[in-house]
Amino acid sequence: MRKTLAGIVLSCVIAASLTACGGSGNSTSTSAAETSAAAGDSTSAAATTENGDKVVRVAAVDPQVALDPQQFTYSIVMKITDNITESLLTTTSDGLVPTLLAAMPTISDDNMTYSFELLPDVKFHDGTTLKASDVKYSYERLIKMAKMATLLENVVGYDEMSAGTADELSGIEVQDDTHFTIQLKKPYAPFLSVLSTAYCAIYPQEACEAAGNNWGMTTLIGTGAFKLDSYQTGVGATLSRFDDYHGGAVALSGLDYKFIEDVNTQVLEYQKGNVDYVDVDPSIYPVYSSNPDLKDQMHGFQPTGCYSLTVNSKTYDDPKVREAIALSIDRKAICESILHGTATVPTSYIPAGIIGHDDSLPEFEYDPEQAKSLLAEAGYPNGIDLRVTVNTKYQGNVAIATAFQQQAKAAGINVEVEQVDSAAWSDMKKNGGVDCGISNWYVDYSDPESMLYPMTKTDTNSSFWHNAEFDKLMDEGIATTDEAERQEIYKKAEHIMTREDWATTPLYNETKFYLLNPHITGFEMDATFRMFWKNADIQ
């Protein structure tokens, strides 16, 4: 007889249209062919307005939440706020962490004390000067908001603040307006990368406290190249150049984010010349990539992450069954038929370009006969029943789940696809009620810890998988600063997770595409899908 398999979670860790750490897939859309035909062969016009201002217009989905990454981790939130607020340090496309608001810190011999000096006379948009006390306030607020608080868990005093027994972060000591130190509990190699994330942006304490619940809605003040003029759900967000920007003169006059939900309508508006930037959804990529008028305006990049299968081992702990599930998915077919050639079958959970990636590993394969044998060895000679739960907000995920349903039959796995709304999905995943689900995750900073960390903590580990050797390697990896040592440590850690315990197994690596007005130069996008316009211009 068949037995029900509980506890498989398909986790998407690839860049998505809405979230940095959750939610991915295609929006509901009209026919791409109809849209392309309606638009004809028109191309985008220059974004310069009649009075000579240079305003870039960006098509985007509606965040429908406050523009505050400390509370909401949607990627569209950060696409906007990254041009308004800044962190102490920044990141480059190759993973380096140069200065932004502070000079590179002096680090103690034991790698546990970081001494910072802020750059002089950095102004917030309200005219006040950046102070070290604003840095401390911003990091304490991050912990109080809880959403991404664990980024700072290695700072002395974090435990007390997160437990509610302390109101301030004792590990940060402010010496004066421009000098402060951060004390860690133990050496933590990715620390500077963590401080470069959008979650660690620096807010002016006085203005943020005064705004209260309106922070990110009617008020958002930073040190960035652009300041927020307006934000209206259902309409858009407008930004204007900050003339006192510490980074020097900015060519653009502003940014105009237009909230458009339908992916084809977004591209249609681009072809009409009404927007200058638009993401190209995989579902419509074949139509627009073959358009000769758009060929030179289509750009691609590979975000750091991959779609993966994660197993709730608290409910079902046999690695043979987890391996069987991994073998029952035809990744190549998904890449070709669902993602239309915009993705490739992975060899490693840790993406290329990050420490710990192993080039020597083979691709994860589709082998339903081997899956059958493994299920029989595990005590399931007649196969298993598996429920796949998907969030109806992301129809692309529904398509993947449906494809998986057909592919798994050959392995003796009977898949039921369950569709739920966002609220139900979040609750079920948090409480272990998802047998198999599709969501997304990709790195917040270019370090293997950002990829593997969710598998070590209860609050982020939806698989409920734990392995003592894996956890030990993770502790070793963050404690050493030697890159060669870290490479070997994380290779071993991933092998345990994806090739021995099969707690997580990748599905695909995706290439994201976007259309950009050819008159625009200097636009920057890094490997974590963050967009920066401060060096852009319109020719």
Regions found by a protein language model. Give the residues of each.
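Bacterial lipoprotein signal-peptidase II cleavage site
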Residues: 21-33
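N-terminal lobe/hinge region of extracytoplasmic solute-binding protein
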Residues: 59-109, 221-222, 530
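Local pocket/hinge segments that shape ligand/substrate recognition
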Residues: 61, 277-368, 392-395, 459-468, ...
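Aromatic- and charge-enriched surface segment that lines or borders ligand/interaction sites
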Residues: 103-151, 181
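Alpha-helical secondary-structure segments
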Residues: 131-138, 177-181, 224-225, 252-254, ...
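Surface-exposed binding/hinge segments that line
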Residues: 153-206
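Ligand-site clamp/hinge motif
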Residues: 242-288, 414
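Detector for C-terminal structural segments
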Residues: 329-356, 396-405, 426-539
